[in-house]
């Protein structure tokens, strides 16, 4: 049996010698992203007393809609979204803060079984944000698009910089080439834990997602343009950067119809 770690920074898990998925990811082995280089990246924050704390990433897909992971928002908390963010610990002068008016979690999401898939949610914002050089909409792939093995992608986020480490202050990025489904679902990788509605990337034992990266984007270069092909979902509970345990993402192209339907009906 495998054990997974979802990558939202709120949830603390014990460790085991068995390898399960964990849904708390941050960028391990990455570097600080150049300011404004990923303007669709958002910080999802929750109210903690009189302050706010980063818990997950996400992608701005409309001026009043954000895409993130279901496991980031399936708790009774008060959330807000910060766009134009770079340094979580200081005012960059480019941020816009907006409340979350409605949360739409995929109806098939099961909190107790991240490996079943459907780890995706949409957040309707209380008001539209203003687009500028610091805040842009993420490009989504065409429905059904499957990336070839070793496609060039970057994960971005403020997650832990190492297993059991601390959240990054500034937005990080790491190069994570894709691992196709045939390889990622083989017994020496994730086996049957991975479904074809997911994308695997990384697995070199150096670079990965980690706690705090959950819900954030996997940006992949296709035909000269970066598009958001993944929503960060889970890593191995044995550690964020375990060899042959690539970071696993919800495959956005499997949910394009659902995304469009939710936005149109809300």
UniProtKB/Swiss-Prot annotation:
It comes from the Eukaryota. One of its GO terms (biological process) is proteolysis. Residues 17-26 form a propeptide. Residues 1-16 form the signal peptide. It catalyses: Hydrolysis of proteins, including elastin. Preferential cleavage: Ala-|-Xaa. One of its GO terms (cellular component) is extracellular space. Pancreas. Basal layers of the epidermis, hair follicle and sebaceous gland epithelia (at protein level). Ca(2+) binds at residues 85, 87, 90, 95. Binds 1 Ca(2+) ion per subunit. Disulfide bonds join 56-72, 153-220, 184-200, 210-240. Its EC number is 3.4.21.36. The active site is at 71 (charge relay system), 119 (charge relay system), 214 (charge relay system). It is found in: Secreted. Its cofactor is Ca(2+). GO terms for molecular function: metal ion binding; serine-type endopeptidase activity. Keywords: Calcium, Disulfide bond, Hydrolase, Metal-binding, Protease, Secreted, Serine protease, Signal, Zymogen. Residues 27-264 form the Peptidase S1 domain. InterPro entries: Peptidase_S1_Elastase_sf, Peptidase_S1_PA, Peptidase_S1_PA_chymotrypsin, Peptidase_S1A, Trypsin_dom, TRYPSIN_HIS, TRYPSIN_SER. Belongs to the peptidase S1 family. Elastase subfamily. Serine proteases that hydrolyze many proteins in addition to elastin. This is Chymotrypsin-like elastase family member 1. It comes from Sus scrofa. The gene is CELA1.
């Amino acid at each position: 049996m495998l054990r997974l770690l979802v990558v939202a920074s709120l949830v603390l898990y014990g460790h085991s010698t068995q390898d399960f998925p964990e849904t708390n990811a941050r960028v391990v082995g990455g570097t600080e992203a150049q300011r404004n280089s990923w303007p669709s990246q958002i910080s999802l924050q929750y109210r903690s007393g009189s302050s706010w704390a980063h818990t997950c990433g996400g992608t701005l897909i409309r001026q009043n809609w954000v895409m993130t992971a279901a496991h980031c928002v399936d708790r009774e908390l008060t959330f807000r979204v910060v766009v134009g963010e770079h340094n979580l610990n200081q005012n960059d002068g480019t941020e816009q803060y907006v409340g979350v008016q409605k949360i739409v979690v995929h109806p098939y999401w099961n909190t107790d079984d991240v490996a079943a898939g459907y780890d995706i949610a949409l957040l309707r914002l209380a008001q539209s944000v203003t687009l500028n050089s610091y805040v842009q909409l993420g490009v989504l792939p065409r429905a059904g698009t499957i990336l070839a093995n070793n496609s060039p992608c970057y994960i971005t986020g403020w997650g832990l910089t190492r297993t059991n480490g601390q959240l990054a202050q500034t937005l990080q990025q790491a190069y994570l080439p894709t691992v196709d489904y045939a390889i990622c679902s083989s017994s020496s990788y994730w086996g049957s834990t991975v479904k074809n509605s997911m994308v695997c990337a990384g697995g070199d034992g150096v670079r990965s997602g980690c706690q705090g990266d959950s819900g954030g984007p996997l940006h992949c270069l296709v035909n000269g343009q970066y598009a958001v092909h993944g929503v960060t979902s889970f890593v191995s509970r044995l550690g964020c950067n375990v060899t042959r345990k690539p970071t696993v993402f919800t495959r956005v192209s499997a949910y394009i119809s659902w995304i469009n339907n939710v936005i149109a009906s809300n």
